[in-house]
Design a protein with these regions (language model features):
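Well-ordered secondary-structure scaffolds
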Residues: 2-280
């Protein structure tokens, strides 16, 4: 069943990449569609990086940028995940996949509809299962992370990053002004409090505490003042910068469960509760 079910994933950031990784490892053909200049921060573990670099490998799964949908089969033939610049999602209508996953984490619906595919899955707040999609995956850290919601919504956006060793808002690096980012440190580098991590439009971006630079937006991406451009991890474990997070894998597991249990994809009379009857 898996090899016959094309899944289009909108977005290739680090959380979306946890989804792509889970699906690819389970044998599903996946197409990632992205912006011309993706806003991914944790680029070392984001399949969106293929847009900039041509290729990226995350924990043994390689993604390749393709120019058009006609190159999907070529990428799949060598075990690679195709990544297509398709900000408007035109490939969804052209390919008519059985599954669409909106993994852009925009905290609002950017136009995804239940009519996009037989199974449409939204990640996090901004979607209503049963209205604009078939299932929602909880993305908020805590007891319900990764849970499949068949009716209703995920927990609301708190506007606050998850706490890591007591650090929350201050672990996020933001652009002090509009411009492009000139990095002075690389992802995985150790940083010290007050050290300059990058420059934006001639203004310095400082490390808020000792740790490692877990993510930094690509230098070709124009940024506005206040935009999230980086992430410092106080745990200081370099390996974490290059491996998929527990959160991303939990969300990916939720998407995998939703696909495998959706009756519109796998009719199984008497196999258990229908999705609409499952607890949210």
């Amino acid at each position: 069943m898996c090899s016959r079910v094309l899944v289009i994933v909108r977005g290739g950031g680090d959380l979306a990449s946890g989804v792509v990784y889970r699906l690819a490892r389970a044998g599903f053909p996946v197409l990632v569609i992205e912006l011309e200049r993706p806003l991914a921060i944790r680029r070392a573990v984001a399949f969106a990086s293929a847009v900039f670099e041509g290729y990226v490998t995350v924990e043994g799964v390689t993604a390749r940028r393709i120019a058009h949908t006609g190159e999907i089969a070529e990428a799949r033939a060598v075990g690679e995940v195709p990544v297509l610049v398709d900000p408007d999602g035109a490939s969804i209508g052209a390919l008519q996949p059985p599954v669409v996953v909106d993994a852009r984490l925009a905290k609002r619906n950017l136009g995804t509809s239940r009519l996009d595919a037989p199974l449409v899955i939204g990640l996090g707040p901004g979607f209503v299962a049963g209205e604009d999609c078939h299932a929602v995956i909880e993305t908020n850290r805590g007891h319900y992370l990764g849970r499949v919601i068949w009716r209703g919504m995920a927990e609301p956006d708190t506007g606050r990053p998850g706490s890591v060793q007591g650090r929350a808002l201050d672990r996020v690096l933001r652009a002090p002004c509009a411009g492009t980012v000139a990095p002075l440190a690389a992802i995985g580098d150790a940083v010290r409090v007050g050290g300059v991590v990058a420059m934006v439009g001639g203004e310095a971006v400082y490390a808020p505490f000792d740790g490692v630079l877990r993510g930094l937006i690509h230098p070709s991406v124009p940024v506005r003042a206040g935009l999230k451009i980086g992430d410092v991890d106080p745990r200081g474990v370099r390996e974490h910068c290059f491996t998929i997070s527990d959160k991303a894998l939990a969300i990916g597991g939720g998407v995998l469960e939703a696909i495998l249990s959706a009756p519109q994809l796998v009719p199984a009379p008497g196999a258990g509760a229908r999705p609409a009857d499952r607890p949210g």
